[in-house]
Amino acid sequence: MKLNTLSPAAGAKHAAKRVGRGIGSGLGKTAGRGHKGQKSRSGGSIRPGFEGGQMPLKQRLPKFGFTSRKSLVSGEVRLNEIAKVDGDVVTIETLKQAGLLVNTVKFAKVVLSGEISRSVTVQGLRVTKGARAAIEAAGGKIEE
């Protein structure tokens, strides 16, 4: 088998519909669009969510809530991800360098998910009760 001899299995590919190419094709003249009307014209499609002038569902329902600006600069790190970070000290900067947090994050919290077997020192991160217990059980410590 060579790359230049690869081809799809027989019947795996369907030929494209050639519309507007004569009566015999079954898709001649109107090309399967029917007669007249908005959808028969070129560019004649309605936008998603348009309900013919009736107030759309999106606008009939009330607005609610907001996006907290703090959530845009906060991150969450799991215990098993911390185990992948090189070095013994875990800070926001080391997490960003390891690719576990995006650069816009200013605050992060360590949550209990997975396990950690080596001892690490967590600096400047908030830690949940379960994660704190797991880190200390592995011989690590937390510095606020």
From Swiss-Prot:
Top-level taxonomic group: Bacteria
Ranges of Gly residues composition bias in the record: 21-31
Stretches the record annotates as Disordered: 1-58
Species lineage: Bacteria, Pseudomonadati, Pseudomonadota, Gammaproteobacteria, Alteromonadales
Protein source organism: Psychromonas ingrahamii (strain DSM 17664 / CCUG 51855 / 37)
Name this protein carries in UniProt: Large ribosomal subunit protein uL15
SUPFAM superfamilies listed in its UniProt record: Ribosomal proteins L15p and L18e
Similarity comment: Belongs to the universal ribosomal protein uL15 family.
GO terms for cellular component: cytosolic large ribosomal subunit
Keywords, ordered alphabetically: Ribonucleoprotein, Ribosomal protein, RNA-binding, rRNA-binding
MF terms (GO), sorted A to Z: rRNA binding; structural constituent of ribosome
An example Gene Ontology biological process: translation
PANTHER family with a match to the protein in the record: 50S RIBOSOMAL PROTEIN L15 (PTHR12934), LARGE RIBOSOMAL SUBUNIT PROTEIN UL15M (PTHR12934:SF11)
